[in-house]
Amino acid sequence: MMPPDIKPRSRDVTDGLEKAAARGMLRAVGMNDDDFAKAQIGVASSWNEITPCNLSLDRLAKAVKEGVFSAGGYPLEFGTISVSDGISMGHQGMHFSLVSREVIADSVETVMQAERLDGSVLLAGCDKSLPGMLMAAARLDLASVFLYAGSILPGRTKLSDGTEHEVTLIDAFEAVGACSRGLMPRADVDAIERAICPGEGACGGMYTANTMASAAEALGMSLPGSAAPPATDRRRDGFARRSGQAVIELLRRGITARDILTKEAFENAIAVVMAFGGSTNAILHLLAIAHEADVTLSLEDFSRIGFKVPHIADVKPFGRHVMFDVDHIGGVPVVMKALLDAGLLHGDCLTVTGQTMAENLASIAPPDPDGQVIRTLHNPIHPTGGITILRGSLAPDGAVVKTAGLDSDVFEGTARVFDGERAALDALKDGTIAKGDVVVIRYEGPKGGPGMREMLAITGAIKGAGLGKDVLLLTDGRFSGGTTGFCVGHIAPEAVEAGPIAFLRDGDRVLLDVVGCSLDVLVDPVEFSSRKKDFIPPAPRYTTGVLAKYVKLVSSATVGAVCG
């Protein structure tokens, strides 16, 4: 049997008389005669200077290229965009966050296809760049390895009352809400602002970036143990070099992304997300990656796995610890080994090491859960996973609630309806949102937003105002991985598609039952149905540019808000 061709595509630009011009161009970037026989590896990086999440990627890309060279390949680095959710939060910029996931996937596909690169190492740090890169890997189905930028170290600050606190980005959003209600002096907000980001790296809690990095490791698309070390830790340079070497070995063995991205691999990723109590954005992103890999994945898979996998990680936003602490006690492999030993993971799934997940875990032999940062399965924080899928008269196609950290399973309250986040923020600032209210923010879905904005500004403000346990928030938009409290998102169908959320009115009674996995409006069905007569959705907010294109293509949140 012939060994796999390690240049399955780049021969299109290096071999034969007709490729003289292409070879001439490649000579100008440093290639010589011997290099034309080597596999060409795209090193795709979302490095930029806009946000600390990606600052380490310039350094890590250099180490990846060293690894590719040492393994006998030739690396060619190229860049793609990244949007900072932390900076774009709470204003018009957040409309562009989720669409950046599609732009990243499309741009990586475009370069890889146009230049006929044989494989890729994909580097990302920000929330949407991680799934964007993994979507590209799944779509292209080449030899691919994913590498995370790493998380930021926790900040520390002293407040005006003399107490010292470990703080993350989310504390700033909550401080704004507290200050607006007179519960915190402005000087303390300033102190928190100056401490939350002490250097490079993604937000430190189990927010979206760290959730997706953990999911990537569980999928088998990144090297075992690579998700948890901080961005500044030089172990990351070692993971980067080994990632460059690994992609060449995958080429030699003929292993491509879809060999790794199986249905069972996605079930492993879901289990790890549930055990960590990770971001609800992981549902959108795993659905989208599965779509690109041609794997059938649905909300029912999240429900099924969530019911049997306990929540065992005491991590922010609901817990006490950050990714730095997870790394200190052994990293993501600690959780994976505990789940594997309990029969909750598929150990036979292939990974980018060329070995199975079980073989990887046996090789690195992670310690048992420490009982503090990571609990044992016999003493979980919650007996089921940290995310619950809801259905009901308000969400016939589904909705998502992050149940990790909730003190109650039932909330019944009175609807306060707002068409967009800004109106809700103004009402909170005015003091007109009260205990027992159900704050409904609609026309924020994938099409209606457009872009399915994250509602961190309002959720942080609600918590900062002391209402985090007393107010239920509903939206057809989505939430930051740092969101806490009674928050239901991804409600589908969305308002602009004439979903039931479009017909809620101030004063309607709404019931959330987490145990029953239901979300209902307590209004006579005949009366509620009568409101649908003559429904006319709002005119599109954007008629030109990328968001106008996005609205024409994007699908429901229930299938990952994918575009085609």
Curated annotation (Swiss-Prot):
PANTHER family xrefs: DIHYDROXY-ACID DEHYDRATASE DAD (PTHR21000), DIHYDROXY-ACID DEHYDRATASE, MITOCHONDRIAL (PTHR21000:SF5)
Family to which the UniProt record says this protein belongs: Belongs to the IlvD/Edd family.
Protein name per its UniProtKB record: Dihydroxy-acid dehydratase
Any Gene Ontology biological process: L-valine biosynthetic process
Annotated EC: 4.2.1.9
Function noted in UniProt: Functions in the biosynthesis of branched-chain amino acids. Catalyzes the dehydration of (2R,3R)-2,3-dihydroxy-3-methylpentanoate (2,3-dihydroxy-3-methylvalerate) into 2-oxo-3-methylpentanoate (2-oxo-3-methylvalerate) and of (2R)-2,3-dihydroxy-3-methylbutanoate (2,3-dihydroxyisovalerate) into 2-oxo-3-methylbutanoate (2-oxoisovalerate), the penultimate precursor to L-isoleucine and L-valine, respectively.
GO MF assignments: 2 iron, 2 sulfur cluster binding; dihydroxy-acid dehydratase activity; magnesium ion binding
Pfam families: ILV_EDD_C, ILVD_EDD_N
Residue numbers binding Mg(2+): 85, 127-128, 454
Keyword Nucleotide-binding attached: no
Keywords carried by this UniProt record: 2Fe-2S, Amino-acid biosynthesis, Branched-chain amino acid biosynthesis, Iron, Iron-sulfur, Lyase, Magnesium, Metal-binding
Residues of the active site: 480
Pathway info: Amino-acid biosynthesis; L-isoleucine biosynthesis; L-isoleucine from 2-oxobutanoate: step 3/4; Amino-acid biosynthesis; L-valine biosynthesis; L-valine from pyruvate: step 3/4
Subunit annotation: Homodimer.
Gene name of the record: ilvD
Modified residues (N6-carboxylysine): 128
Catalytic reaction(s) noted: (2R)-2,3-dihydroxy-3-methylbutanoate = 3-methyl-2-oxobutanoate + H2O; (2R,3R)-2,3-dihydroxy-3-methylpentanoate = (S)-3-methyl-2-oxopentanoate + H2O
Cofactor list: [2Fe-2S] cluster; Mg(2+)
Cofactor remark from the record: Binds 1 [2Fe-2S] cluster per subunit. This cluster acts as a Lewis acid cofactor.
Top-level taxon in the UniProt lineage: Bacteria
Residues noted as binding [2Fe-2S] cluster in the record, renumbered to the chain: 53, 126, 203
